């Protein structure tokens, strides 16, 4: 291999070219590569954060949905209990009213029965006096024998 001036000149030119590239071309290229690398890394980080945020939002939405369902179920259960309570209260009121009406009817029946017994006693007494008049053939004084009729009616 022959080393001559051309090879030395080419080596010097190449060295100057490399130094020139290292001084003026390489820093902007490195800077551009670093900026691009940073943008890509930031984009990936943003995508990861967005994915995590989406996952958290979905989890939170699911939790809120479960809570809403639980609240709805609780409200429905409370409504059912309240409805059952209202039905039971209505039944109790109906029973009380029925008992009151029944007691009132029994009292009226008892009163009518007593009135009928008193009327029957009076009629029996009048019939007894009428029968006694017919048997004795004479008129019995109603005022004089009222006590006798009352005793007879009380015995019947």
Swiss-Prot record:
UniProt GO cellular component terms: plasma membrane; proton-transporting ATP synthase complex
Keywords carried by this UniProt record: ATP synthesis, Cell inner membrane, Cell membrane, CF(0), Hydrogen ion transport, Ion transport, Membrane, Transmembrane, Transmembrane helix, Transport
GO MF term set: proton-transporting ATP synthase activity, rotational mechanism; proton-transporting ATPase activity, rotational mechanism
Transmembrane segments: 12-32
Protein topology in the membrane: Single-pass membrane protein
InterPro entries, alphabetized: ATP_synth_B-like_membr_sf, ATP_synth_b/b'su_bac/chlpt, ATP_synth_F0_bsu_bac, ATP_synthase_B_chain
Record's subcellular location: Cell inner membrane
Cross-referenced Pfam families: ATP-synt_B
Oligomer status and interactors: F-type ATPases have 2 components, F(1) - the catalytic core - and F(0) - the membrane proton channel. F(1) has five subunits: alpha(3), beta(3), gamma(1), delta(1), epsilon(1). F(0) has three main subunits: a(1), b(2) and c(10-14). The alpha and beta chains form an alternating ring which encloses part of the gamma chain. F(1) is attached to F(0) by a central stalk formed by the gamma and epsilon chains, while a peripheral stalk is formed by the delta and b chains.
Protein family according to the UniProt entry: Belongs to the ATPase B chain family.
Summary of the function given for this chain in its UniProt record: F(1)F(0) ATP synthase produces ATP from ADP in the presence of a proton or sodium gradient. F-type ATPases consist of two structural domains, F(1) containing the extramembraneous catalytic core and F(0) containing the membrane proton channel, linked together by a central stalk and a peripheral stalk. During catalysis, ATP synthesis in the catalytic domain of F(1) is coupled via a rotary mechanism of the central stalk subunits to proton translocation.
Name assigned to this protein: ATP synthase subunit b
């Amino acid at each position: 291999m022959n080393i001559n001036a051309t090879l030395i000149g080419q080596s010097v030119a190449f060295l100057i070219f490399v130094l020139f590239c290292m001084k003026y071309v390489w820093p902007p290229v490195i800077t551009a590569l670093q900026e691009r690398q940073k943008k890509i890394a930031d984009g990936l980080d943003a995508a990861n954060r967005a994915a995590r945020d989406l996952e958290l939002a979905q989890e939170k939405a699911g939790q809120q949905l479960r809570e809403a369902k639980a609240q709805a179920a609780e409200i429905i259960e409370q409504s059912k209990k309240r409805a059952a309570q209202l039905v039971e209260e209505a039944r109790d009121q109906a029973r009380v009213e029925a008992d009151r009406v029944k007691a009132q009817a029994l009292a009226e029946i008892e009163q009518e029965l007593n009135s009928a017994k008193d009327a029957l006693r009076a009629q029996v007494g009048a019939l007894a006096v009428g029968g006694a008049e017919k048997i004795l053939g004479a008129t019995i004084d109603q005022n004089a024998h009222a006590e006798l009729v009352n005793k007879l009616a009380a015995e019947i």
